Amino acid sequence: VTTQDIVGKLWKLCDVLRDDGITYHQYVTELTYILFLKMAKETGAEDSIPAGYRWDDLAALDGIELKKFYRQLLEYLGTECQGRIREIYNGASTSIDEPANLKKLITSIDELDWFSAKEEGLGNLYEGLLEKNANEKKSGAGQYFTPRPLIDVMTKLVKPQAGEKCNDPACGTFGFMIAAFQYVYSHTNGFMDLDGDQAQFEYEKAFTGCELVHDTHRLALMNAMLHEIEGRIMLGDTLSPLGKNLDGYDVVLTNPPFGTKKGGERASRDDLDVLTSNKQLNFLQHIYKSLKKDGKARAAVVLPDNVLFADGDGAKIRANLMDKCNLHTILRLPTGIFYAQGVKTNVLFFTRGTSDKDNTREVWFYDLRTNMPSFGKTNPLKQEHFADFMKAYEAEDRTKVEDERWSVVSRAEIAAKGDSLDLGLIKDDSIVDYEDLPDPLTAAENAADTLEEAVDMLRAVAKELKQLGV
């Protein structure tokens, strides 16, 4: 039994709950509450859960008693417990109305092959569920899932080292930090090359994040816990004053959310160089501010095309970035890997300088977009798609790389173009600006209206056919 099989079974259970009108995202959250108790039992970690509120206590009940106890359990764990458990269950409520559905969910989870699941790693199992959820629900609240192959490529090229502080200021379900943890783990012989204090630092302090959306924050905590990572994951907005304290990092890996701040207001940070309502530009400013000023601290960040072209504030922020950091590489990503087919994104790789001036001399571009297939559900992005880019990136002498997708532009040429980074590329006319994307709620309401109209028309046709005796 593979992780995929178990994920498939857990996912099928969602159909049971569709009758209760539960969305996929609510299902994953609900599943997290129940899975947590089962996984604690399976891994011998039940001591951290108060007696009377454990898996067996839940599994023993049914009917209205079960429903009542489950609600009580959620509230108790979210208020009376300490640490991670309290964070995961804080403010938890259930969307399951029908006790029989809740019982079916508990029974089905109990019947899964937990021996195989443990062999494969419970963390992998949970990440599989999160990925499935992301594919079912590509957009919404500006949240989306970064494809694992892209996370792995970015992590491999940034090369986090033991002893370094790594952070994701918009951490979603914590995928980047888990990849960074696994990278360090595998490059230190499972931390065996480190002494006790060093290994403890990796587990407890090296990998941290911040997430704005409460439900997503829960999933991040659960994901981290299943991978034995105890680093702090804050619930809050990096672009609020809270973000000022997120600094002194050696490595930042992130894919900040799409869209503008609600209502287009400016970030409430007073320490950013340029005040703008463009969320990605604010995240970019936060990231280069949050790196240690030591000539080694580095970041890889997924950003939309408008960050490369926006004039005014955008040009100022890019000039700042190129002054304070060596922006050495930009990877133009193919389309279709995020929720909206037309949305175009890039990965910016940069290293913080020791000074605040003239750190970028030239920028290398790799165009992985032009003449590439569009990726999506039927054509998923895989790590091999990045092989040529990785070869060019890691080349000892970048000028000797023979690849038509690889080009370099000097800082002077960039300045001559008003600090636009729309250079060295085949012009593509289908650029979508994030500001022009419809608000997810409006888009959903419009779609619902259209479907209702279609249903009404079909009913009218059926009625007419009936009258005609067809």
Locate each region found by the language model.
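Non-catalytic, mostly N-terminal accessory regions of nucleic-acid modification and defense proteins
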Residues: 1-162, 232-243, 332-336, 359-376, ...
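Short acidic (Asp/Glu) and glycine-rich catalytic loops that position anionic groups and cofactors
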Residues: 11, 200, 228-233, 263-267, ...
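Conserved Class I SAM-dependent methyltransferase catalytic core
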Residues: 27, 212-217, 277-350
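Short loop segments at secondary-structure junctions
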Residues: 40, 351-355
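Conserved S-adenosyl-L-methionine
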Residues: 140-254, 259-261, 270, 275-277, ...
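A generic structural signal for well-ordered coil/turn residues at beta-strand boundaries
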Residues: 203, 248, 252, 343-344, ...
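Switch/connector loops and helix/strand junctions flanking conserved nucleotide-binding motifs
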Residues: 242-244, 259-262, 309-312, 339-342, ...
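Short hydrophobic/aromatic beta-strand or adjacent loop that forms the aromatic wall/cage
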Residues: 343-347, 376, 386
